[in-house]
Amino acid sequence: MHPLPADHGRSRCNRHPISPLSLIGNASATSGDMSSMTRIAKPLIKSAMAAGLVTASMSLSTAVAHAGPSPNWDAVAQCESGGNWAANTGNGKYGGLQFKPATWAAFGGVGNPAAASREQQIAVANRVLAEQGLDAWPTCGAASGLPIALWSKPAQGIKQIINEIIWAGIQASIPR
């Protein structure tokens, strides 16, 4: 092993400084070199930890969202359309859950909601519920059996929680 030159901050040809990261594992690194590495490593470690927290919280919020109670879509359909999943009453809304064509298409529905199966309508309704809450069914949402307060704009609440976690991670990674 070759000893370092007397000038630890320069390479052998004295043109390029040696990076503190290149001294990792070098037994002859000085305490000044180590404190330089610490200044670099601390924010990186804090950022990695913040990213891990955000990832974990997103996984947890997804698990919590799926673990919640399911709405009674048959009861909502009974209220909206008399339980007729093929309803076309001429009011501009279709199917058992009375979708407007624009809402149906925006949340992944294909064709006319009145021609879709009960299961297809429920799949789209679950996506609408996740984004808009029970407010999407202002008259019959209460028939779902879910507490209106919990299901009014659930995606907004999850987004707010994630933003707060990200902000806390950013604050934690700023060197003081």
Swiss-Prot record:
It is an enzyme of class 3 (hydrolase). Its EC number is 3.-.-.-. Induction: Expressed in actively growing cells, positively regulated by alternative sigma factor SigD, probably directly. GO terms for biological process: negative regulation of gene expression; positive regulation of gene expression; quorum sensing; regulation of cell population proliferation. InterPro entries: Lysozyme-like_dom_sf, RPF. Disruption phenotype: Not essential, disruption of rpfC alone has no effect on growth or survival in liquid culture, nor in mouse infection models, although colony size is reduced. Alterations in gene expression are seen. All 5 genes in this family can be deleted without affecting growth in culture, however triple deletion mutants (rpfA-rpfC-rpfB or rpfA-rpfC-rpfD) are not able to resuscitate spontaneously in the presence or absence of O(2), and are attenuated in a mouse infection model. Residues 1-29 form the signal peptide. The lineage of its organism: Bacteria, Bacillati, Actinomycetota, Actinomycetes, Mycobacteriales. Belongs to the transglycosylase family. Rpf subfamily. The keyword Calcium does not apply. Pfam families: Transglycosylas. This is Resuscitation-promoting factor RpfC. Gene3D superfamilies: 1.10.530.10. CDD domains: RPF (cd13925).
